[in-house]
Amino acid sequence: MSAIDTLIRGRQRDLGGFSVHRVLPSGPRQMVGPFIFFDAMGPATFAPNTGVDVRPHPHIGLATVTWLFEGELLHRDSLGFTQVIRPGEVNWMTAGSGIAHSERTPVENRERPSRLHGIQSWVALPRHAE
């Protein structure tokens, strides 16, 4: 008997200029415990004057967890927080009753080729934290 219940094969998803390997949600599993989305980003290489441009968008009732192996992402949100996420650092954004945020390659990194490699997961919050 195996301890593995379901093997989920990821699929490529375009996020506007770069692709992620998305494992969740999937046909056989929409969630695993509190995990709603699970994306592997890259490794991706961007030419000069290009990069990640995830425009402002809303979230509600969840937390996003971003961890980079390589590259940098500029996180900005509607609560006024700005953070450059670097390799080995974690960005945990709790949406609760609502937040909007963007993720972009920092301006200073766009002058030269850049790389991005990391993971991002969306975690459902308990009802009392929404």
Predicted regions and their residues:
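Short, Gly/Pro- and small/polar-rich lid/capping loops
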Residues: 1-10
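Short, compositionally biased
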Residues: 104-115
